[in-house]
Amino acid sequence: RVEEVTVCDAATVARGRAWRTPVLYKVAVPGRHFAINAMGVLAVTHALGLDRALAVTALGQWQAGAGRGLREVIVLDKVEPHLTLDLIDDAYNANPASLGAALEVLAGARPKDGLGRVSHGRRIAYLGDMKELGREEQALHRALATRPGMERIDIVHCVGPLMRELWRSLPERQRGHWCEDSASMAARVAHDLDAGDVVLVKGSLSMGLGRVVDAIRKMGHGPATV
């Protein structure tokens, strides 16, 4: 079981117990949920009789894939390569638990001040509808406004009719744009983002938030770095 998790800027370190002994491991991406999933990997390793030390080493090099929490540094100016923003591409799916975990990661991120025209870095979220939640879908979207860590996010942009429930529930200071579809939101990103920002993009796959991710990548000069 996982007993302690420390989320750092570029990694997550966890302590727990497995096979009746203490275990210490890390994953090369921030996120409490990644550490919990990693303990499951170690349990499978043990069940299959594989090398635990080798598994721990591999976890220390593991990074999230595209659409599932991949972090990229987008260089915004080829003349001044220090002008960057950080992108968290989590656009493949969304439900209340996974979105809450992603918001926790964003809330703990460190924007960079003094880089762009806004002068201070911001935590910005682009959130699309969470699908297939049944009768409580509107209430579950509204409830995101009071999730732990939400108060640390500077601007929340919302996509889709269900996320409009969240948009209406947010304080005025956090309320960004609301758009019916991802294409409309993607057309705005170049005007809304600046150097120093940390940006999360997340929504159910059918909402097409990958368009927003692509629009952010197109702001870059040269290949993005992970």
Give the residues covered by each predicted segment.
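Short amphipathic beta-strand and strand-loop transition segments with alternating hydrophobic
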Residues: 3-6, 71
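A short, compositionally biased
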Residues: 7-13
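A generic structural motif
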Residues: 15-17
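ATP-dependent carboxylate-amine ligase
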Residues: 10, 20, 26-33, 39-226
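Short, surface-exposed loop motifs enriched in S/T, G, D/E and P with embedded aromatic residues
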Residues: 2, 25
